[in-house]
Regions:
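Aromatic-enriched
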Residues: 180-243
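Membrane-interface transmembrane helices that cradle and orient dolichyl/undecaprenyl
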Residues: 1-3, 38
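Perimembrane helix-loop-helix junctions
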Residues: 24-58
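Aromatic-anchored segments of alpha-helical transmembrane domains
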Residues: 12, 60-68, 154-163, 191-204
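Aromatic/glycine/proline-enriched transmembrane-helix motif characteristic
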Residues: 44-51, 60, 64, 81-160, ...
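Membrane-interface catalytic loops of GT-C/OST-like multi-pass glycosylation enzymes that act
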Residues: 161-172, 203-212
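Membrane-interface alpha helices of multi-pass inner-membrane proteins
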Residues: 3-29, 152-159
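Helix-to-loop transition at the C-terminal end of transmembrane segments
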Residues: 66-84
Length: 243
């Protein structure tokens, strides 16, 4: 119980920084409920109620303790939605909403982008929440490992989240790295990381497109020159095989 309470404390602290941290509380709670069912023979509904009550107690106690010790009160609540004020092209629901609004303007229907975004973003969140609920109950039934359920649910959440930054994928990658060990997962993570290193500049710099193109072209030219010099040097030295 000490380890369970400690995990709840850490996850609650994480959730006060980023609301997605609270997701872990649900999967830890489901794992605990599964433990009660298998080890103690507790009825499913009773084990579920016990796990929910325990996690809620830990959450409320942690929020009260941290808020009192830091002196910030509940200010962390209002600061959670700051990212939702921007339009992120990486977000599926936002991209669909903006694209639909753009085509609506082309058809002469007026600019209804904000209203469309409200619909698409709400639908995206509902889809993510529904899938997360499915993963929670799959964890309770023992059909998926809690870490795998957390990673899969987080991945779907990132896909349908109203705002997505490149590093949001870490919400899913970190738990999935401890559960998914197939080559396709590793390849996908490497490919995504490599692509984002080109699409998004360090520190979120918003440079003009012409500047970004100049940087990439210069880097490509420098790489081509270095590769050509290396090839010439290897052939002139008579080296056939690199040991």
């Amino acid at each position: 119980y000490l380890a369970l309470a400690a995990s709840g404390f850490c996850l609650s602290c994480a959730g006060m920084v980023k609301v997605t941290g609270f997701i872990g509380l649900g999967f830890v709670g489901m794992a605990y409920a599964r433990y009660l069912i298998e080890k103690n023979g507790t009825p499913r509904w009773k084990a579920l109620a016990c796990a929910i009550a325990l996690q809620l107690v830990v959450l409320v106690a942690t929020v009260a303790l941290i808020s009192a010790c830091t002196g910030i009160g509940l200010g962390w609540v209002t600061g959670q939605g700051g990212a939702a004020s921007i339009r992120s092209w990486l977000s599926t629901s936002t991209a669909v909403g903006v694209g639909t609004g753009f085509f609506g303007m082309l058809l002469g229907l007026g600019d209804h982008t904000e209203a469309i975004l409200t619909v698409t973003r709400t639908f995206g969140v509902l889809v993510a929440v529904a899938f997360m609920a499915r993963m929670l109950f799959a964890t309770l039934r023992g059909r998926i490992h809690p870490v795998g359920g957390l990673g899969t649910a987080s991945l779907v959440l990132v896909i349908f989240f109203p705002v997505v930054h490149p590093w949001y994928i870490l919400w899913a990658v970190l738990p999935l790295a401890a559960w998914a060990n197939r080559l396709i997962f590793r390849f996908s993570v490497v490919a995504y990381s490599a692509a984002m290193s080109f699409f998004v500049l360090p520190r979120g710099l918003g440079l003009p497109p012409s500047t970004i193109i100049a940087i990439y072209v210069s880097a490509a030219c420098a790489y081509a020159v270095i590769a050509a010099l290396w090839w010439v040097a290897v052939h002139r030295s008579g080296i056939r095989v690199l040991d």
